[in-house]
């Protein structure tokens, strides 16, 4: 792989946790460098490169800084991290930890694996691959001056044979095999005190993340939300992100419903010490052999679930005068031998959208090759909240066939209503597109069924409304005000494919 592009990231001398540093556009890095690899890219047209990203900076074991390099190809987190960078966003997309104490770091970024589609040498409307640099754990010692590190991009651009590659996820009932990528827990912070302490990592791994008033859907949480609970052996790694002058001995145990009753029980419980390389493996403990992956709103995680508790059985210690807490970052890499409970919705329809409170009699809804962001000015729209909707939200593109079931309720007495529901399949747009099959259902039928092909001329469809030439559905209501509600359910048929791992804020 040859040098394809370069950039630089400026770092303030007082680099604190949560600050945003810079965003580098991969395409701009390559085109701006204008080297031989860019010429190859222009010749190839579309490519699925395996980038090697080298971040060059001098090692310093005294600052305690850890940065995050986050990869987002669909502009899902750009506006949310422009001032402060919450881990709810930076850790919800593919990311890599950059420890100041380690010095220059190399990361492999396989575009074909992460996005599942080819990359064009010029800007496109559906993707814009970027590297975001933010600070996860801040410095203990302020440096003498502001500085910068260099980011080098290495790649070999060979022509791709098709636009679509391997999907990131295929909908099926047995989708989870235990492997988890990019599942990083926000820093656990230990106080410097004489009292031994513990920090808990909740195993509510199917719960939707929350940032203030916003929900953040990411792939790992969505994948695990397909199941009610899970058991097995949690494998992962602990990164001690403090300066080298700090020290700690950690023991991890899995506990149900809170913490151990006394210190002796901690050593009697099955557990393990964190090895020098940070690795650990611990079986989930639960009276049900499984722990729930989500909770009811009023329930406390410490009372109804298993947790991984990281006990500081010795330390943390630091030189006199230090007051900053000791940050530790946990990454979960696998749940080996997963003991999965029943699916949340086994082989069933998902609620897509409800329409109600109609204010006009003649109503028409455009259902494009996408799933969400449906709106109306003449009725009330309520979108369903379910794993399938979340999976589409946390990907850039999707493709497959949906079986649709339409149902409605009437305002007046049954048998005395008139009007109907017309469903038409179309391609392109109303003015220049083509009309396909159409059917009319009387309101007194109370429902009907159809299907929708999700995709466009390129194959998979971006999460935008009719952004490319694609198939879509028009639902026209006659005498809409005589309906209380129109409900649309959907069920993915066969292998429904998702491309481009990312996240989504609502």
UniProtKB/Swiss-Prot annotation:
According to its UniProt entry, the protein's GO biological process terms are:
transport of virus in host, cell to cell
**Pfam families in the record:** Nepo_coat, Nepo_coat_C, Nepo_coat_N
Q: Which GO terms describe its cellular component?
A: host cell plasmodesma; viral capsid
Key words of the record:
Capsid protein, Host cell junction, Transport, Viral movement protein, Virion
UniProt PTM comment: Specific enzymatic cleavages in vivo by the P1 encoded 3C-like protease yield mature proteins.
What Gene3D superfamilies does the entry give?
Answer: 2.60.120.20
| A molecular function GO annotation | structural molecule activity
UniProt lists the family membership as follows: Belongs to the nepoviruses RNA2 polyprotein family.
* Functional note: The movement protein is assembled into tubules that allow the transport of virions from cell to cell.
Spell out the note in the miscellaneous section.
Virions are comprised of 60 copies of the coat protein.
| Protein name from the UniProt record | RNA2 polyprotein
Which species does this protein come from? Answer: Arabis mosaic virus (ArMV)
């Amino acid at each position: 792989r040859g040098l394809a592009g370069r950039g630089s990231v400026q770092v303030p001398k007082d680099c604190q946790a949560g600050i945003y540093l810079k965003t580098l556009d991969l395409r701009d890095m390559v085109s701006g460098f204008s080297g031989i690899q860019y010429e190859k890219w222009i010749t190839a047209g579309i490519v699925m490169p395996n980038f090697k990203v080298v971040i060059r900076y001098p090692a310093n074991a005294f600052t305690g800084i850890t940065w995050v390099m986050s990869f987002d190809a669909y502009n899902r987190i750009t506006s949310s991290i422009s001032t402060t960078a919450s881990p709810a966003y930076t850790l919800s997309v593919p990311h890599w930890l950059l420890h100041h104490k380690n010095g220059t770091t190399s990361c492999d970024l396989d575009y074909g694996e992460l996005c599942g589609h080819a990359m064009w040498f010029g800007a496109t409307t559906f993707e814009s691959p970027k590297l975001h640099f933010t600070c996860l754990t801040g410095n203990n010692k302020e440096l003498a001056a502001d500085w910068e590190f260099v980011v080098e991009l290495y790649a070999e651009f060979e022509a791709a044979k098709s636009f679509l590659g391997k999907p990131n996820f295929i909908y099926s009932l047995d989708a989870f095999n235990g492997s988890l990528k990019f599942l990083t827990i926000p820093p656990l912070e230990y106080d410097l005190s004489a009292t031994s302490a513990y920090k808990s990592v909740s195993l509510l791994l199917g719960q939707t993340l929350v940032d203030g008033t916003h929900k953040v859907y990411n792939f790992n949480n969505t994948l695990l939300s397909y199941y009610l609970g899970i058991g097995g052996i949690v494998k992962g790694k602990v990164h001690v992100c403090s300066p080298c002058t700090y020290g700690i001995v950690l023991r991890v145990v899995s506990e149900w419903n809170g913490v151990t009753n006394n210190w002796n029980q901690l050593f009697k419980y099955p557990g393990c010490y964190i090895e020098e390389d940070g690795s650990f493996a611990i079986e989930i403990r639960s009276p049900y052999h499984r722990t729930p992956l989500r909770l009811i709103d009023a329930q406390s995680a410490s009372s109804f679930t298993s947790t991984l508790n990281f006990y500081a059985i010795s330390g943390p210690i630091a030189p006199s005068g230090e007051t900053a807490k000791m940050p530790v970052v946990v990454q979960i890499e696998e749940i080996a031998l997963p003991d999965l409970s029943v699916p949340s919705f086994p082989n069933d329809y998902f609620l897509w959208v409800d329409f109600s409170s109609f204010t006009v009699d003649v109503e028409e809804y455009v259902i494009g090759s996408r799933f969400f962001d449906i709106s109306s000015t003449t009725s009330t729209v309520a979108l369903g909240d379910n794993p399938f909707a979340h999976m589409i939200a946390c990907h850039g593109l999707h493709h497959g066939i949906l079986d649709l079931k339409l149902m409605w309720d009437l305002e007046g007495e049954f048998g005395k209503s008139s009007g109907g529901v017309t469903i038409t399949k179309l391609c392109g747009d109303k003015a220049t597109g083509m009309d396909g099959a159409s059917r009319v259902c009387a309101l007194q039928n109370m429902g009907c069924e159809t299907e929708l092909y999700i995709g466009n001329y390129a194959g998979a469809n971006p999460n935008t409304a009719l952004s490319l030439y694609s198939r879509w559905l028009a639902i026209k209501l006659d005498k809409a005000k005589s309906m209380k509600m129109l409900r649309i359910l959907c069920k993915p048929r066969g292998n429904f494919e998702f491309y481009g791992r990312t996240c989504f804020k609502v």
